Amino acid sequence: MAEGKAGGAAGLFAKQMQKKFSRAQEKVLQKLGKTVETKDERFEQSASNFYQQQAEGHRLYKDLKNFLSAVKVMRESSKRVSETLQEIYNSDWDGHEDLKAIVGNNDLLWEDYEEKLADQALRTMENYVSQFSEVKERIAKRGRKLVDYDSARHHLEAVQNAKKKDEAKMAKAEEDFSKAQVVFEDLNQELLEELPVLYNSRIGCYVTVFQNISNLRDVFYREMSKLNHSLYEVMSKLEKQHSNKVFVVKGLSSSSRRSLVISPPVQTCTAFSPVSPVTSPTSPNALSVTSESESVSATAEELTSEAVGEDSCESEESLKDEEADEDQSETSSSEEEEDEDEDEDEEESLAACNGPTPTPAPTPAPASPAAEVKSQEEAAPCSPTSSLGRGQTGKEHSPPGEVVLRARASSEGAEQSKRTASVQRTSAPPSRPPPPKASGGGLSSPPGSAEASKACHPRASSDASSDPEPPETGEKEGTGSSGPKEPHASSTKSATQVVSNDENTEL
């Protein structure tokens, strides 16, 4: 009995070794191109899809296992944190009993989430992946049967093409070929039908797994949100109970620590809409965050106003230049008219005081500066009131050339100076003939004529008293001052010459 079993096992082993040898020989011949390999493009495409599906399934299964492991770790961590909070929470603080219920519900919620996630997601994915090994074995078996089929076919062709034909060998070769063909075709047909179905089943598996995950997370986070609201209310009560004990986080204003801003939990009604974190009104950092946002908005407004102001400055400056040119032209024309009126008044007053105009005589030598100063000192006490009024009006009446324009850019300084000089030249009064002068050899006037001329010519006396400096100083001031001051200086000089001529006549 034992010998029969040993002989049967030896025969089976020899048969398997013979198959392996024939398969290896066939593969070598196929690689060398001695024989033709049977190919099925439809099966090859299905097999390629299967291997890709298998790789993706194993990857997703591995990630889900890591996800479940992380949930377990998070559950343990949350449990330890809750237990520690319950231990350090004093019994005389508000919400002590509520905190116990929150800690217990938190642990139960994590446990339920972990169990359902493992059952509805991980086990579903595990069942999906487990079928890959069976299909993979069948594909490998199909490959071996394909080699047997090719080997039997090639052996039959060799027997049929032999010069010496043996009917027994030919019959046995045909029988072997028929068996190999039936086995291969049956297995190949089964795989051609199963592989596409298995490949399409991946969609249903993904839908089922992630629907379960999303539902579990939705329920878990909704219930956890309620617990978080309850915990936040307990901490708010504790804060109100000890409102004088404030904890300030140092370095919170730093840009790298903005995540430390304390925020209340998100409202449950807006769980499916994008929610921005709201700063707690009781937080000591709410004012700092508000001030930072206000400063940012103010900076943005300043940048916007500067950008708009730069655009409008150019147009305003051009308008100001045109207005300034028009004002200067109007001012110069009005000043010319005033100067002409003053000249006419002076000529009339001189004609009235001096009487009939004498015949022109040779011009005498100019008086010395000392004589002019003396004449000015003698003419000064004649009319102090008129000289005082003249000085006040001279101060009040600003020369037309002193139009002050607002300074603009530094690049426009040269253009403004040239423009001011041109305005001064255009605003200068027109040249007029000098007033008549009395000569030493002319008609002699009575002694009282000088006093009468002084009395009748208050303008000259006021000019003389208001400007007691010598002519050289006046000329220096005239050259240093702007152009519109020249008419006043010329009128003062002419009046001084008239007074000096009258004194010479009297002498």
Curated annotation (Swiss-Prot):
Compositional bias ranges of the Low complexity kind: 273-307, 444-467
Modified residues (Phosphoserine): 273, 375, 411, 439, 445, 449, 461
Top-rank taxon, per record: Eukaryota
GO MF annotation list: phospholipid binding
Domain BAR: 28-244
Entry keywords, A to Z: Cell junction, Cell membrane, Cell projection, Coiled coil, Cytoplasm, Membrane, Phosphoprotein
Tissue: Detected in spleen, mast cells and macrophages (at protein level).
Biased composition (Acidic residues): 308-349
Membrane association type: Peripheral membrane protein
Record's subcellular location: Cytoplasm; Cell projection, Podosome membrane; Cytoplasm, Cell cortex; Cell projection, Phagocytic cup
Biological process per Gene Ontology, one example term: plasma membrane tubulation
Cytoplasm listed as a keyword: yes
Polar residues compositional bias, start-end: 489-507
Family annotation (SMART domains): BAR (SM00721)
One GO cellular component term noted in the UniProt record for this chain: anchoring junction
Pro residues composition-biased segments: 357-367
Subunit structure: Interacts with BIN1 and ARHGEF7 (via SH3 domain). Homodimer. Interacts with ARHGEF6 (via SH3 domain), SH3GL1, SH3GL2 and SH3GL3. Identified in a complex with ARHGEF6 and GIT2.
Comment field on protein domains: The BAR domain mediates dimerization and interaction with membranes enriched in phosphatidylinositides.
Function according to Swiss-Prot or TrEMBL: Promotes cell motility and migration, probably via its interaction with the cell membrane and with podosome proteins that mediate interaction with the cytoskeleton. Modulates membrane curvature and mediates membrane tubulation. Plays a role in podosome formation. Inhibits phagocytosis.
Protein name: Bridging integrator 2
Species the sequence originates in: Rattus norvegicus
